Amino acid sequence: MTDFFHVILTKPLLNLLIWLYNVIPGQDIGLAIIALTILIRLLLYPSFQKSLKSQKHLQDIQPELDEIRARHKDDKEAQTKAIMEFYQKNKINPFSSCLPLLIQLPILIALYQVFLRGLSGNIAGDLYGFVPDPGSINTNFFGLANLANPNPIFAVLAGGFQFIQSRMMMSRNQPGAQGMANVMNKQMMYFMPVLTGIIAFRLPAGLALYWVVTTLFAIGQQYYIMKKG
């Protein structure tokens, strides 16, 4: 299973990263990571767009869900049944917004291996015939940071931008909205950015750079879809 995952995901992404490193002027692995991130986000754009629209729809109907919960507050079984009937009547899948996360998880796992190999230069035997081996890899991002090592600035940026993204989504909630989902969302808005920052602080800065760029892309996409809606 590990070999299959390597062949279908890790190896192609590694080759794409090295190809970008070879063709982008300056041979800066940071620029190659940014370019790879943008390509991945464009590839996943349709699924993220669908997810954001689903989240927006769920937030728009939050007052009606709160009303159902208040109506059946003393009968949890009736409350659950009424909510499910409401979802079915309005053709809503409450789990559809989780799809991009499920898609992104294996990509993140693969990218972890890609960046470890790429940043260390341990790429021999994994390159396709049409991708030249650059030899040594320049891991200094514009000469300012070594992406092969953890970097606290990138870790803080990764957590900070994720907080901004979460805050943008929460700001659409109705003032005073209650309910378990709303309470959990508020808790996750603070917990996940902190967790992201801690993880990023322990990993090579190249992975944190990926997370910064992909989150910035998501913020722009989220702003566009919410304003358009």
What kind of feature is each model-predicted range?
Residues 1-229:
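Helix-loop-helix
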